[in-house]
Amino acid sequence: MTNQTVRGTKDLLFDEWYKFKHIEQTASRISSLYGFLPVQTPIFEYTEVFTKTLGDSSDIITKEMYTFIDKGGKSITLRPEFTAAIVRLLIEKKLQAPIKLFSIGPAFRYERPQKGRQRQFHQINFEVFGIEDPKADIELISLAQHLLTEFGINKNVKLEINSLGDSETITQYREALISYLKKFQNDLSEDSQNRLIKNPLRILDSKDKTDKEIISDAPKISDYYTKESSYFFDQVLNGLQALGIPYTVNSKLVRGLDYYCHTVFEFVTEDLGAQGAVFAGGRYDNLVSSVGGKHTPAIGFAGGIERIMELINYAEKKERPIYIIPIGGEAEEHALTLASELRRNGLYVIYEYSGTLKTRMKKANQANAKVVLIFGDEELSSKTLKIKNMDTGEEKMIARDKTVENI
């Protein structure tokens, strides 16, 4: 057995753990300000939960899912993203829309590990169901901006936004794009050739140099907007302007999954290298009905916690400990009782089990102790303690039953 983590996973220690929890807690707190309700789904689902929703041409389905057959012969997949599982939850539990749902947890994708991208990663996830009004899009993007501000990274993260329009827009644009790209079919990358028929819009998001040159002159989706699609997108952009949220319209932004329509957006930064998206999401009005639910317009976004951790400066404000140093047999026996009492009063206590007084005092100093409590058998008999302030060096005797008040 190899004593190392599996490639694409990482341990979380000490200060990094505090940073992780800070992100979780901040996201949870902000979600409640916007009326989101917390939910949690299992980390694995029946495989069809994802294959039905993510589209058979997406990279997640074709390359990245962790899928296995369980002992009952069922195909099971570790969650690669949240939306599919949340939609399953919405339908199975018969939740009444409109409703806003917030979730946090791990997800799994078989990808090439790099900065900001691991095979096990964690996401904060926001989904709004049952609201077709563009104000829902505006509010959700505003929430994302609010979070970035809370994390202190809003200045280096920029909003890119696009609209894929409604079903009619997507159908007409898809035909026009295929017609254009077929002229260059043999020059496209292998991935883009595979996508040409199944999901040509994904080619717009290609990172291949030749693909980029080809799509630079491709038809623009905005030329195919229906009147309704154009009005919807204008309403979203006007709302962002009213809130003072700067944005750039990126006509090549399509997102990586097949279920999106109308608004799609990413908050991006150059500080993460190739993995520039901090938050990403969009509208998916037809997804719920496509998997057997009622027609339920929806919009959502997710953010990778590990990516946010790469960007934020956060250090947990560490409480200084109370150090207990007993001297003598009876005092040693009583030390745990004292430590337990102080901890139940909300104090951080270190009880040093052994060593000379000099050694223990040195360790108390290294631990940046606030005060040291010293007592031997004599103090135990007189129900007193010596308390030493480690900042001033002041020492005094106090009554044992007044310990908490004197700290």
From Swiss-Prot:
SUPFAM superfamilies: Class II aaRS ABD-related, Class II aaRS and biotin synthetases. GO terms for cellular component: cytoplasm. Its EC number is 6.1.1.21. GO terms for biological process: histidyl-tRNA aminoacylation. It is an enzyme of class 6 (ligase). Keywords: Aminoacyl-tRNA synthetase, ATP-binding, Cytoplasm, Ligase, Nucleotide-binding, Protein biosynthesis. Homodimer. This is Histidine--tRNA ligase.
